Amino acid sequence: MHIIKPSWLSHCGEQKDFEVYSCHVSPDGKRLATAGGDGHVRVWSTESIYNANTPDYNKPRQLCHMSHHLGTIHSVRFSPNGRYLASGADDKIICVYHLDKNPPAATFGTNEPPPIENWKTYKRLIGHDNDVQDLAWSYDSSILVSVGLDSKVVVWSGHTFEKLKTLPAHQSHVKGITFDPANKFFATASDDRTIKIFRFTSPAPNATQHDMVNNFVLETTISSPFKSSPLTTYFRRCSWSPDGNHIAAANAVNGPVSSVAIIERTRWDSEINLIGHEAPTEVCMFSPRLFHTSKPDPSVDDKSPSLVTVIASAGQDKTLSIWNTNTSRPVVILQDLAGKSVSDLAWTPDGQTLFASSLDGSIVVAKFSEGELGWVAQPEENDKALQKYGASRKGMGIAEDVDGLMLENQSKAGESRAVESRMGALMGDLPDSTKESTPVTNGTKTTAPTSKPATNGQSEAEKDKEPEKEQEKEPEEAADKTAQRVKELKSRVTVGKDGKKRVAPLLVSSSGTGTSSLPQTQLVGTTSNNKAAQNDAPQTTLDLAKPFDGLPKGGIAAMLLGNKRRLNLGEAEEEEEPVSKRAATGPTTIVTNGHDSVEPAALVPVQHGVVPTPEFLRPAVMNPSIAFAQVRLAVPKIRSHVLRPLDRGILQGESSLEDASKTPENIILEAKNDPNPRDPSHVLVSKRGALIWEEWLPRAIILVTATKQFWAVACEDGSIHTWTPAGRRLLAPIILESQPVILEARGHWLLCITAVGLAHVWDLKTQSSPSPPVSLGPILDIATTSLNQHSATPGPGVTSAHLNSTGHIIVTLTNGDGYYYAREMFTWQRLSEAWWAVGSQYWNSNDSSISALQSTAVGPASKEGKDKESTKATVSSGIIPFLERHTTNEFLLKGRAYGLQRIIKMVVQRKEAENLESSVSIAHLETRIAGALQLGAREEFRLYLFTYAKRLGAEGARVKVEELLNSLLGGILEENEEEEDEDDGHGWFSKEGDLCGWDRKELLKDVVMILGKYRELQRLTLQYAKVLDISLEDGPVDVEQMDVEA
């Protein structure tokens, strides 16, 4: 063993060395981070420390120093993935740093050596009310937990660094935190003389605090080893053994003697105490590696030496003791290691070197030789030791006691299939290959390198290098022209009315290059697997028609003809400015935001022979019927070219239909209108530049759409023409009451919305319509009063209209609302609105359980074939999350939620409305379930049902739970001897058959399992468990697969 104590390894001050409160070694073992009373975090090279006595060594010692705190820094910790470094201080702030690849800048006005590495502040986390005393990362770096003198335990996301949860479990200062290497628990030590164990499941990368309602649950409280422990220690830094079996707790007592308590996992009691310190201990730290008691013999495979763990402890007696589990006495005792208390310990990843920091400002290194502590075992031995705790099965929640094992044995088989199913993916149980291929971020898009198969000794990637080099030259050449053009725009001088010259201001538009942080939904059949694998933005299957590119950004304007006057009208009120007088397009954009700077907003040049979307030729000729209609929608203008690719739609990374039309595999429908209204229009269908068929029409073409079953175009005179894929006329022209404004297709369904607000839906396969024309008047607030009885007033605009695979209409409006037309009831139903966005705890457009995954649905075995089951599984899939994200875009992100949020906050403060948030959250879940049931969205229905059941259980809503179980039970146990006159119900009132495509009995069994852990409901759930014959010997049930993060 070698003791290394360099004189330069300290936090030096002008008059004295500052106290060093914390130290930690990076996962690669190359850096040592220390935090001290000078308010600095310093990063040192461990290689320079090991070579402190080598005169010829001239490499840098201090790699970087950061001074972003306003006081003493108490804790510093590297994340296990090595990406971040976190520090907590007495300024109540947590700083998270990341290593920037750019060279560092020299610090002005300091004697510090120039930094070698550029560690920059990535996030500043504010959530404590007093000093931050200790920090710890989970072993998968998914969460960061901080503890402090405000008695709080705060959990932060390790990806977004959003505050996920605050745990006010302790009654006094919290001074220590450690994580279970199996990633199932973490333990906190406090001056209330307890250690509390919290169970958790690693959250998804884009999880929010609303997802963590039932996560981070207190498992147990341990107090017996600390009943008379002193409160004079600065820290209570505890540590978890690398095999997951034990927790070492500092500042414990065994009678009158100070000790280190060893707490056994699962039983959570302490029968072992390490006695030897003469004063209270501040810190104890397990070596991260397991050790063999004797040197392993590679030739003997059958027997390997026994494994032990090594632990170091230190504290106020200035003594460092090192123990292992094979002996009752310390292996090493280093007395008077420092002049004051030892504040922190840190092992290197190889388990052979120990760093110790002290309040006297010194940092000591103890470097051990092979065999002194034992022989270091391979990292695979750690994994084997943790397998019994389910460390390799993320999010499974393996039972660790008898009760948990019994609960696990009550579930049904199918664990392996659930991993591949969408429900298994929604529970976070993805296979490793999937996680690597589709990493998830909070709505940002990054591309991962993918390897291509080699052909004839040369990979496809190498073949692609030459054209890539040619493409790289083009941006470089264009960059100079761009910069020159921007310079000209910036220096453009105008002369005002007064004759003075001034530089004209620039309008910078970010719409061209800005990307939203919200998840980007992919359409069914529109995205290739390779594209999906390279994009790690949240994905989901969406059963809707492709969006039409001709709609304006603000949606189609709607005018409503009122039929009543408003009450209490003031004569002095001014009428609103007519929509026709407002600028339709706004000011002309001169420059746009580029990747590095502003760029001129030049028109996109013609590429691959494809003409970009042109300016309109003229307005469409209006039908006289619009003048008498109560609903009037804006009619698209006549464009010279209208393009539509067949069914593949817009691929990821492509911003327009023009980009999609450049894809060689796409079949393109192109409509060309002549500038002369009297000349016919030309319809062409081509593939890879080759003409498939063409036709001329006597009227100008406004809209086009296409599926694999048919082509359709809408003309200026209100007629719709349809063709087969080969170009044969499918139907005679369909004549409508006014001009079409929206034309969409999905499968063999065709949707057309006209200028008078009527929606027509046709099934071209059966050449029929499921319902008469539907008016958009009810959802456009036509029933509201207007200022003038005979004048039109603006209403909410239509942002999109879609069809799902069963021909149902989905409409979104500019006010954020999303609607679905229930043709069985001949009425519109609102599936998403702003009220849920500001009042529900379950509103989350970045919901990891829905939008961050893309997989197939697997449910109970159906009597039909697998193809039919797969088709049934995707019906209406993703529609409700899509509508809620639209509401977020239209309502919350445009700043219109403040007023409603303020009203809700004022109402919640009243005593009679203290349960408003809970009530609104439950109502939101009930609306989701009702919408999913009406749409037939089986995956969303099951997910929302389980979330709803868990919330009802947490609320103890016995009446609703009983009614829910009765509705799920239906007629499972009833015989078929009922009266024939009684009509069969639908949805919750149905007695037989599946419920939204799921087996009633399986749904009921899963809901009973979810509710079974709530004791106040066990009398009720036990009855249903007996009815369903749920016994302890039924077989394995994966409860966590049914568990939904609320």
Swiss-Prot record:
UniProt xrefs under Gene3D superfamilies: YVTN repeat-like/Quinoprotein amine dehydrogenase (2.130.10.10)
Functional note: Required for replication-independent chromatin assembly and for the periodic repression of histone gene transcription during the cell cycle.
Lineage: superkingdom: Eukaryota
Single GO biological process annotation from the record: regulation of DNA-templated transcription
Protein name: Protein HIR1
PANTHER family the UniProt entry points to: MEMBER OF THE HIR1 FAMILY OF WD-REPEAT PROTEINS, PROTEIN HIRA
Biased composition (Basic and acidic residues): 460-497
Keyword Phosphoprotein part of the UniProt annotation: no
Major localization class: nucleus
GO cellular component: chromatin; HIR complex; nucleus
GO molecular function, one term: nucleosome binding
Cell location: Nucleus
InterPro entries attached to this UniProt entry: CAF1B_HIR1_beta-prop, HIR1-like, HIRA-like_C, HIRA_B_motif, WD40/YVTN_repeat-like_dom_sf, WD40_repeat_dom_sf, WD40_rpt
Keyword terms, alphabetized: Chromatin regulator, Nucleus, Repeat, Repressor, Transcription, Transcription regulation, WD repeat
